[in-house]
C-alpha cells in the first residue's frame, strides 16, 4: 500500500507543480505582452475606435434610416400642401405645410422659401397657424410622457 500512496502523492505533486509552472508561464506572457509598445498602441487604437461608437447616439438624433424617412415625409408634406393650396383647400394645405415645418432641419430657411413663393396673405395665414400646431404638438408630447410614466 505504501507504494500506491507514494504514487498518488507523487502524481498529485507533479500535477500541482505543472499547474504552478503553467500559471507562472501565463503570467509571464501577459506581463511581456503588456510591456510591448505595439500592444499598447493597438489597445489605445481599439479604445479610441470604440469610444465614438458609444457616443454616436448622443450626437446623432436619428439614425440614417429614420432620417431618410423624415426627409421623405417632409417632401411629401410640402407636395401635399402645395396641391391643397392649388385646389383651394387652405386648411389642409396649411396643415401639411406646418407639418413639413415641424420636421424640417432648417425651418428658418424653409420659412424664407415660403415667404418668397407663397402669396403674402397665404404666408401670413401660415405664420398664424404655426403657434397653434406647435401647441398641439406640445400637448401631444405631454400626454405621451404621462402614458410612459404610468406603471399600468
From Swiss-Prot:
Entry's localization field: Mitochondrion outer membrane
Entry membrane topology: Single-pass membrane protein
Positions on the Cytoplasmic side per record topology: 28-152
Regions of this protein lying in the Mitochondrial intermembrane compartment: 1-6
InterPro entries found in the cross-reference section: MAS20, MAS20_rcpt_metazoan, Tom20_dom_sf
Main location (coarse class): mitochondrion
Domain of life: Eukaryota
Protein name: TOMM20-like protein 1
Gene of this entry: Tomm20l
Amino acid at each position: 500500500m505504501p507504494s500506491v500512496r507514494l504514487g498518488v502523492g507523487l502524481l498529485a505533486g507533479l500535477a500541482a507543480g505543472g499547474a504552478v509552472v503553467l500559471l507562472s508561464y501565463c503570467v509571464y506572457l501577459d506581463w511581456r505582452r503588456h510591456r510591448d509598445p505595439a500592444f499598447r498602441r493597438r489597445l489605445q487604437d481599439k479604445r479610441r475606435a470604440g469610444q465614438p461608437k458609444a457616443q454616436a447616439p448622443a450626437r446623432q438624433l436619428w439614425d440614417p434610416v429614420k432620417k431618410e424617412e423624415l426627409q421623405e415625409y417632409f417632401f411629401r408634406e410640402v407636395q401635399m400642401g402645395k396641391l391643397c393650396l392649388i385646389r383651394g383647400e387652405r386648411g389642409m394645405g396649411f396643415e401639411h405645410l406646418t407639418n413639413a415645418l415641424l420636421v424640417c432641419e432648417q425651418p428658418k430657411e424653409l420659412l424664407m422659401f415660403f415667404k418668397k413663393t407663397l402669396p403674402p396673405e397665404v404666408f401670413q395665414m401660415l405664420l398664424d397657424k404655426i403657434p397653434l400646431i406647435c401647441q398641439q404638438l406640445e400637448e401631444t408630447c405631454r400626454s405621451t410622457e404621462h402614458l410612459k410614466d404610468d406603471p399600468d
